[in-house]
Amino acid sequence: MTKKALFTGSFDPVTNGHLDIIERASYLFDHVYIGLFYNLEKQGYFSIECRKKMLEEAIRQFKNVSVLVAQDRLAVDLAREVGAKYFVRGLRNSQDFDYEANLEFFNKQLADDIETVYLSTSPSLSPISSSRIRELIHFKASVKPFVPKSVVREVEKMSEE
C-alpha cells in the first residue's frame, strides 16, 4: 500500500521552513502532494501561477513530491481525490500547535480516516514565516537567507519592474 500525504498552505511565498517540512515528509511517505490553496476572495502577494512556479522549482530535487493547485475547496476533499491518508503539518511554536489542533479537530469530523502528522520545524528555521518574508520584501530587505532561490529570483524581478 502506497503511503500518500498532503501538505497544504498558501505558500505566499514558499520559505526554507516549508522546504524543511517537505523534505522530511518526502522521507516518511511514498508520495507527498503539496496542496497550494488559494481563495479568489483574497488577493495574494504573489499570483497563484507565480507561487506554483516557485514551489515547483524549489521541490524539483524531490522525486516523490508534486504540487496541486486547489481553489475554494476543503483539504479533506483534495486528500480524498488524490488518495492521501495523511495530512502533514509543520509546527514552529505553540501558537501553531493550537491552530493546527483546532484544524485537526474539524478535519477528523469530516474525514476520520485521514491522520494528521505533525513535524516540528528545525529550530534554526522556526522564526521564518511567509508574512515576515512579505514584510521584508515590502521594505526591500534581503530575503536570501530565508527562502529558496526560486523566490529570490521572483523578488529580484519585482524590484526591476
From Swiss-Prot:
The record's listing under InterPro entries reads: Cyt_trans-like (IPR004821), PPAT (IPR001980), Rossmann-like_a/b/a_fold (IPR014729)
| Record: residues binding substrate | S10, K42, A75, R89
Keywords (alphabetical) are:
ATP-binding, Coenzyme A biosynthesis, Cytoplasm, Magnesium, Nucleotide-binding, Nucleotidyltransferase, Transferase
Q: Where is this site: Transition state stabilizer?
A: H18
A GO cellular component annotation here is: cytoplasm
Look up the EC number in the record and give it: 2.7.7.3
Protein function: Reversibly transfers an adenylyl group from ATP to 4'-phosphopantetheine, yielding dephospho-CoA (dPCoA) and pyrophosphate.
The similarity annotation says: Belongs to the bacterial CoaD family.
* Designated name of the protein: Phosphopantetheine adenylyltransferase
Question: From which organism does this entry originate?
Answer: Streptococcus agalactiae serotype V (strain ATCC BAA-611 / 2603 V/R)
Which gene name belongs to this protein?
A: coaD
